[in-house]
Amino acid sequence: DNQRPITCLNTMYKWYTSCLLVPTDKHLDDYDLMEGAQRGARAGCSGTMDNLLIDRMVTLDCHRKKRNLSMGWVDVKKAYDSIDHGWLEEMMIIHRFPTWLCRTTKYLSRSWSTRIVVTTRNGREASEIIKFRKGLPQGDALCPRLFTVCLNPIAWKISASEGYRLSKPIGTTITDLLYIDDLKIFAASESKLSSVMNSVRAAMEDVGLIWNPKKCAVAHFKRGVRVPESTGLLMSDGNVKIPTLEDGQQYKFLGVLETLRQEEKIVLRCAAREYLRRLSVIWSSPLSDYHRVIASNQFALPAMSYFMWTQHWPITELRQVDRDARKIVTEGGGKHPCGTTSLLYLPRDKGGRGLRSVETEYKETKVKAAVKLYQNRDPAMKMVREFEEQAESKGYQSMTKEAGKYAEEYGLQLQLKHPDPVCVTEEGEVVPGDKLKTRLRKLRESRMEGVVEEQKWQGKLITARKEDGDLNTEQCFWWL
């Protein structure tokens, strides 16, 4: 049951399906056929970030306004491997794709096959060709889009439900969050949630998708407080029961642990533990110092940076994570115990080590997240903008408030106006949103250089090298 074979697709097939993806997306965009709640496999859309922001908005609205809310999380067994090919062909016709594209997809689905090759002492032995009678291969560009097309009618059905209506003055209804096959359903009561989940389960079985009850869950809240006597959700056929989240139990949705609200403290603790674990592996390895830093920035740091876009963490705890990280680097020989901390985060071409700070990464991510929120043209994100502005005006924790505070530390003033937010420097220069990342990096490096220049030991040495006319600064640091 736990086997999930992945077939290695050849390069020409991947290139061919990438070419087919262009007219497929164009047809869906031109006729607005994709349900808006489906934010997976969509070009130019940060699906997980958008869904988590909407999820945070709904749960905070329930908590702050003492509202009734029922939520259901749905997990599907081997979703990609279960799509019926007949349903795929029917969906291509229902969505009125061009005839040539329907025929091509039909031909591809009927030609999907593989073979198992085993290397033994007697040589290589190959099995007969194994035909795929159902399911979509993983690894090409087209199949994720075909999968979302197959789920489109289910998304339409959920969007027709009553859902959960946000408090005034927003007052918009949220029915569900969908990212590929990760589904979360909202309802105003337990009975309404039961009705929606029964209809969704029946519709998914028509597609060939089977729920995994052990990984599904429901939670009910009245006046913002969890209902303790809830015993779970019994499906209409009486054979499947969806368990209720118990006290102290969380559900992981799109990588974030949550109950009524997203558990930001637990997420930070788990992310920091994984980040430090990866750092320990990297700095105890035989890699060179340069590659250790690259691995730390590109392998270890993403364990935390993924959550920074949507979570709100205390700066004091992030500074503690940085201290623990520097301790690991020092024990691994990447920093002298008496060495200056600033040089550790200064770029290598300027005499530093090039490591990225968790605190700095968090602050810059918050500024970029606020700008990205106001650049987003998704109609659903308008609600998030209004919610964040309303939270800021009432003194609640807000992304826009945090972003403005952190931008001021870089000498920038945020002007968040949809759809073209900008930053204004102290000199009055206007920085558009698409150039903000580069400007933040330059300001960070400039500020770090200023800190290093004030140091009386290593900083003085670095500054002397830069000011010495007989030395080439670039050649001095190229070996780093």
Residue ranges and their predicted role:
Residues 45-48, 110-116, 216-230, 346-351:
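Short, conserved secondary-structure transition motifs
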Residues 22-27, 51-63, 192-208, 272-277:
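Inter-domain linker/hinge segments that demarcate the starts of reverse transcriptase
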Residues 200, 318-330, 403:
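Short amphipathic alpha-helical coiled-coil/interface segments
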Residues 237-315, 333, 367-383:
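Basic, alpha-helical interaction scaffolds
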Residues 78-95, 136, 176-205, 222-225, ...:
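Catalytic palm subdomain of template-directed nucleic-acid polymerases
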